[in-house]
C-alpha cells in the first residue's frame, strides 16, 4: 500500500512541477511521462488524461488507490452529467470545476446550509418609487463590490452573503473598500438563530451585528472555516449596522428596484445537483423549489440584465473565483427561479 500511496503523491507533485493546467492545449504530451503509472492505478479510460489535468489544476490529493479510483469514477459520472446537460443547448452550460470529483451528497453536506424559514421577508419594508428602472445594472462597475471569497468546507454561505452586502454598503457610504469577518458571524451569531457552518440567514446576521455593536475586519478576526468560540473584540469593530431592509417574499419587482437604486442585496435560493458545475449562461431549473423552506444557499445579487432575450440576475457566489463565471452566475429573472426572491435583504450601515 505504501508503494501505491507514493505513486499517487508523485503523480500530483509531478504534474504541478510541469506547470500543467486544465486548459493546456496539448496535455497528452505533457503528461506522457507519467501516463503509464496513472493507468496502472485507474486503468485505461478515455477520461484518464482529463482526470490528470483536473487533479493537477485543483491540487487534488488522494491518499490511497481506492480513494483515487473512487474519485475517478465520480469524476467520470460528473463528466457525463456535463456532457448530457450541454447537449440540450439550454441557456447555460456546465463545466469541470473543483467539485467535479465530489458526489452531490458530499457537496450538499460541505457547501450548503440547512433550510430555514425566512420570516423576516413575509412582509417587506423596501419602498418602490415611481421611476423608470435602468435596463441593466452591475454594481461592480461602480467599484463597490468586493472580491469573490471561498467559504471552503463549511456551510457558512450566509456569512459571506452578509459580509458581501456590508462591504458594498460600506464602500458606497464611505468611498473605500473593506474586508469584513465571516468568522465572527460563524462563531458569535448563534443567539440570532444562526448555526455557524450548518447555516444561517443574512437578515438574522444583520440583526446580530446591529445589537452586538458591530463587525470586525477580516484581518482582525480571520476566517478558519470551522465552528469556534466567539472571540469578538469591540475595539476592532469596523462597521456597524443601523438596520436592514427586507424584500417582500417572492417580490422580484421590489428586489429589482432595490438592486437598481439601493445597493447589492443578500438573496438566497435552492441549489440543486447540476448547479455546482455551472460554468456560464443564464441558469434555470425545473427541479428546484421556491418556498422559504427550499432555499439552502445565500449569495449576493449585484446586478441584472438581459442575455439572448432572457432577463437575469447577476449574482456573486462564495465558492472561489475559479467557480462559474469568475465566481459569479446569472439566474433567470421573472419566475422567482429557485426562490431567488424568497429571502432577500440589505443592510443600512453606520
UniProtKB/Swiss-Prot annotation:
Interacts with KPI104 and KPI106. Composed of a mini chain and a large chain. The large chain may be split into heavy and light chain. All chains are held together by disulfide bonds. It comes from the Eukaryota. Its EC number is 3.4.22.16. The keyword Protease applies. It comes from Medicago truncatula. Keywords: Disulfide bond, Glycoprotein, Hydrolase, Lysosome, Protease, Signal, Thiol protease, Vacuole, Zymogen. Disulfide bonds join 154-197, 188-230, 288-338. CDD domains: Peptidase_C1A (cd02248). This is Pro-cathepsin H. The active site is at 157, 297, 317. It holds the Pfam family Inhibitor_I29. Residues 20-113, 122-132 form a propeptide.
Amino acid at each position: 500500500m505504501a508503494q501505491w500511496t507514493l505513486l499517487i503523491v508523485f503523480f500530483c507533485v509531478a504534474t504541478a512541477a510541469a506547470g500543467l493546467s486544465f486548459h493546456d492545449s496539448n496535455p497528452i504530451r505533457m503528461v506522457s511521462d507519467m501516463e503509464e503509472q496513472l493507468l496502472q492505478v485507474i486503468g485505461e479510460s478515455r477520461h484518464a488524461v482529463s482526470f490528470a489535468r483536473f487533479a493537477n489544476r485543483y491540487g487534488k490529493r488522494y491518499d490511497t488507490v481506492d480513494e483515487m479510483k473512487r474519485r475517478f469514477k465520480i469524476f467520470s459520472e460528473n463528466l457525463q452529467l456535463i456532457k448530457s446537460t450541454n447537449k440540450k443547448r439550454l441557456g447555460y452550460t456546465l463545466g469541470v470545476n473543483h467539485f467535479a470529483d465530489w458526489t452531490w451528497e458530499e457537496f450538499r453536506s460541505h457547501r450548503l446550509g440547512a433550510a430555514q424559514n425566512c420570516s423576516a421577508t413575509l412582509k417587506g419594508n423596501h419602498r418602490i418609487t415611481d421611476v423608470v428602472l435602468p435596463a441593466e445594472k452591475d454594481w461592480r462597475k461602480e467599484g463597490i463590490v468586493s472580491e469573490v471569497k471561498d467559504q471552503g468546507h463549511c456551510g457558512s454561505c450566509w456569512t459571506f452573503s452578509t459580509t458581501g452586502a456590508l462591504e458594498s454598503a460600506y464602500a458606497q457610504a464611505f468611498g473605500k473598500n473593506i474586508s469584513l469577518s465571516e468568522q465572527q458571524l460563524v462563531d458569535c451569531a448563534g443567539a440570532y438563530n444562526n448555526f455557524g457552518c450548518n447555516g444561517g440567514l443574512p437578515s438574522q446576521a444583520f440583526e446580530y451585528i446591529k445589537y452586538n455593536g458591530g463587525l470586525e475586519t477580516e484581518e482582525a478576526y480571520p476566517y478558519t472555516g470551522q465552528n469556534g468560540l466567539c472571540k469578538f473584540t469591540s475595539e476592532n469593530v469596523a462597521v456597524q449596522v443601523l438596520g436592514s431592509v427586507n424584500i417582500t417574499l417572492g417580490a422580484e419587482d421590489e428586489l429589482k428596484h432595490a438592486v437598481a437604486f439601493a445597493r447589492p442585496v443578500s438573496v438566497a435560493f435552492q441549489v440543486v445537483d447540476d448547479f455546482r458545475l455551472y460554468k456560464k449562461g443564464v441558469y434555470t431549473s425545473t427541479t428546484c423549489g421556491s418556498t422559504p423552506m427550499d432555499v439552502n444557499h445565500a449569495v449576493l445579487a449585484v446586478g441584472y440584465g438581459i442575455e439572448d432575450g432572457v432577463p437575469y440576475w447577476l449574482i456573486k457566489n462564495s465558492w472561489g473565483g475559479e467557480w462559474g463565471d469568475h465566481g459569479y452566475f446569472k439566474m433567470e429573472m421573472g419566475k422567482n427561479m429557485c426562490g431567488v426572491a424568497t429571502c432577500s435583504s440589505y443592510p443600512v450601515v453606520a
